[in-house]
């Protein structure tokens, strides 16, 4: 069990580095904390359209329903990891831009501490930001200008959850979240006529 926890910790560390390098290339990520990602951590939950609160099974980690951890066998160790791929096309009446991005998506693990107490932990991206836009304008005072807006980075979210079985068919659970990361924005103004 100790080897499994060590392996999962190492994978989580490398996963955090992969999150920081994710590049979404979406103009929608300009606003707020960026483009908020799907909260469903498990691929089975995403495949069902994000239905997660009702899912309650011992063979998967459902971070959106922490009481579901109580269904995990007390001798089991669950490890789940995923990858993310997205292909997008952005177009206007005369321009089109394609972008494809792949990144490490999430890592989570769950295990039983006692027959009535189960624990889960994991990390996943909360939001991503990646855009580069240029705006050309002409002003009578200075002439032609080009403004470049660029943003990169995002926020990650780690969680630690516990579930307690308090009856044959009743369980309660709660998660604690920690959100961290950075978003870098840059605005550059060029004066092409001033050369």
Please provide the spans of the model-predicted regions.
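Sec-dependent N-terminal signal peptides
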Residues: 4-14
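Subset of outer-membrane beta-barrel
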Residues: 21-195
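Sec/Tat signal peptide C-region and signal peptidase I cleavage site
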Residues: 14-20
């Amino acid at each position: 069990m100790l080897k499994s926890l060590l392996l999962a910790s190492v994978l989580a560390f490398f996963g955090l580095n992969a999150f920081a390098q994710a590049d979404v290339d979406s103009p929608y990520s300009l606003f707020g904390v960026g483009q908020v990602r799907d909260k469903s951590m498990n691929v089975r939950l995403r495949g069902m359209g994000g239905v997660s609160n009702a899912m309650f099974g011992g063979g998967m980690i459902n971070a959106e329903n922490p009481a579901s951890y109580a269904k995990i066998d007390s001798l089991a160790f669950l490890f789940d990891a995923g990858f993310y791929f997205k292909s997008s096309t952005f177009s206007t009446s005369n321009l089109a831009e394609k972008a494809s991005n792949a990144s490490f998506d999430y890592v989570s693990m769950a295990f039983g501490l006692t027959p009535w107490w189960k624990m889960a932990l994991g990390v996943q991206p909360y939001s991503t930001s990646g855009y580069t836009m240029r705006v050309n304008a002409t002003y009578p005072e200075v002439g032609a200008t080009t403004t470049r807006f660029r943003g990169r980075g995002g926020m990650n979210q780690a969680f630690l959850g516990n579930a307690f079985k308090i009856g044959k068919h009743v369980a309660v659970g709660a998660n604690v979240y920690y959100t961290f990361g950075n978003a870098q924005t840059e605005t550059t103004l060029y004066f092409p006529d001033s050369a």
